[in-house]
Amino acid sequence: MPLLPSTVGLAGLLFWAGQAVNALIMPNATPAPAQPESTAMRLLSGLEVPRYRRKRHISVRDMNALLDYHNHIRASVYPPAANMEYMVWDKRLARAAEAWATQCIWAHGPSQLMRYVGQNLSIHSGQYRSVVDLMKSWSEEKWHYLFPAPRDCNPHCPWRCDGPTCSHYTQMVWASSNRLGCAIHTCSSISVWGNTWHRAAYLVCNYAIKGNWIGESPYKMGKPCSSCPPSYQGSCNSNMCFKGLKSNKFTWF
């Protein structure tokens, strides 16, 4: 099942406005067939930053902000989602994101991991108030995305996006992408589409299970939590399939 194709489009113009600029989904539109999740976990373990070099490139505050913002977007999708899963932090995904971010390469990667893991990228030159500022443009793509009606998915769902790209948003709200791991690294120098940026904040977010498959919609439309996977045993919180305590508090932005 191929991934959604990517187009650079107008995203690069955001640089001149002083805003966060976003990379797109990997241009390779024909990945290898799905492999067992254990394969991805072995790759994640092999791609971690060596312990002697390890310095966490994300604070607990930023980690919570990234996770809470994603869950806020997932809980408030329209049309409502019947099978949206609550997203949790995954240390292995975060370490893989850290290993990639520290290389300061403005591209999706590493290539061997992209077969199994979704990824969103953002880069910002200058000051920013919150890590949320680095990913707001991802969620704002929802204004350009038209969710396919069930009658249009016969059997494959059409891809409808009237903007430069919508695939950052669809990865954020892909129902089964219930694990997130991100890293932020300040690159002293990084080449972004032919321009050299200095002291740029580089955000890498990895997602599992990988989303953005052609012919599939991000989630199943319907009453919230009405089609949760059996593993959730009917537990629901804030419009999402939820395995934790129902008293869990979320911080919305």
UniProtKB/Swiss-Prot annotation:
Residues 25-56 form a propeptide. Coiled coil: none annotated. Gene3D superfamilies: CAP. It holds the Pfam family CAP. One of its GO terms (molecular function) is peptidase inhibitor activity. Belongs to the CRISP family. This is Peptidase inhibitor R3HDML. The gene is R3HDML.
